[in-house]
Amino acid sequence: MSTVLSVKDLCKTYIVKKNSNNVLRNISFELGDGEFVTVMGPSGSGKSTLLYTVSGMDAMTSGSVNFAGRELGTLSKKELSKLRLTEMGFIFQQMYMMKKLCIFDNIVLPAYQAGMAHSEANKRAEELMRTLDIIETAEHEINEVSGGQLQRACLCRALINEPKVIFADEPTGALNSKAAADVMRELIKANRGSTSIMMVTHSVRVAAMSDKVLYLMDGDIQGEIVLGKLENEDTLPERERSLRNWLVERGW
């Protein structure tokens, strides 16, 4: 398996009132092509910060992040912006959709910006919205839809450019069980189509659907468990039990 994301000795420090807060400490890991990796850990362990930093949304303090052969730390703002637009997809807890645009236009905009033909982009956006059961929200503004609908719209937007990697921070956190299942079904479908996924979640059941889980505590990776591809949903309960036992051993 070739590597799409290679992280070495990554550190992230915030300075607050002249005090240093070392949120990430010498983090190293790899994400392979078509691999689905989840990061778990207690609240405040640095999970979301890790996701933002390795995706170039937040600057690293030191270390190396290599995305598909390019060192993020050496890219200009313009180069990094283009890379995020065309090769990365994002589902973050605070997605900054444009308030003046309807849901459909928010979803399709990244495809237009990436140079996709408008007819193709419109067709793809409509297909994604139908699959995730939010086509009725197409002309609604973002303040006119539920949190669950907005989260599914974020997934549509993340998928529209068929990115190399999707970075997802609690993608099912605001959803009911049906909507959560729909989101995970689409993420797994994208992953089987060779898109790599790096996800943060507190849900053991959701994490058990991934190939590998990293355990983050106090800004450091304390261990990993390899679950392999989820080939049959009937095996999910056993995967969930194995993962839960592994997490408990680490103080979960």
Where are these regions (language model features)?
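The feature captures the beta-strand-to-loop junction immediately N-terminal to the Walker
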Residues: 40-42
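Helix-to-loop junction immediately C-terminal to a conserved catalytic motif
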Residues: 55
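Conserved ABC transporter NBD signature motif
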Residues: 63-71
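Short coil-to-helix segment of the ABC ATPase nucleotide-binding domain corresponding to the Q-loop/switch region
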Residues: 101-109
